[in-house]
Amino acid sequence: LRAATDKFLLSRDAARLLPENEALFRVALRSDDIDATYDQLRRTGVTVSPIVDGQRNDPQGNIIRWRIFTIDGDTAGLVYPFVLQWGEDDATRLTRLRAQRLDAPHPLGDITLEQAVFEVVNPQAVRDRWQALLGFPPLGEQGLDVGGQQFIFREGAANQLTELVFRVANPALKGQRFRVGNGVYRFT
């Protein structure tokens, strides 16, 4: 187990950070074609792990499958994301989640992830590198459009993901923010 932990980047992240530093750290990017994404990233020259097949059983005994790989390294101290592909297409997955009542409406109303905010020393340089590496269209000078959500790069010393911003329908939640460890969750 120790050897496997040493080899897998996400396990190394957890071993290095936890339990002292609960933080938003490395984002996941979902792919519908992980093999093509893997090949494209390898061609850019970054170090990628092998693609690993994973699975677990949900509480009802159904097998949930996925494929995953990590991108080693960073841009000016900001670690790269990891890439994940679920073992079923979105429509099938959503149908299964609804049948299991896991895709039920949230009791507080509609909540949608809108932004992942990264605090970095040089926002434009990091944005430009991630745009070149990941292919997302630019959003202003310091952001990327990530399929309807946004990566926002703000100037600061943390060099990590620091905040998740959610759009909410419930007026009582608007303007609220809370912290879990070193991560901020904000509702707009």
Residue locations for each model-derived region?
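Internal, well-ordered alpha-helical scaffold/interface segments
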Residues: F82, I111-E114, D128
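Amphipathic alpha-helical segments
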Residues: T37-T44, N122-P137
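Vicinal oxygen chelate
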Residues: R2-L108, T112-N122, L139, G143-T188
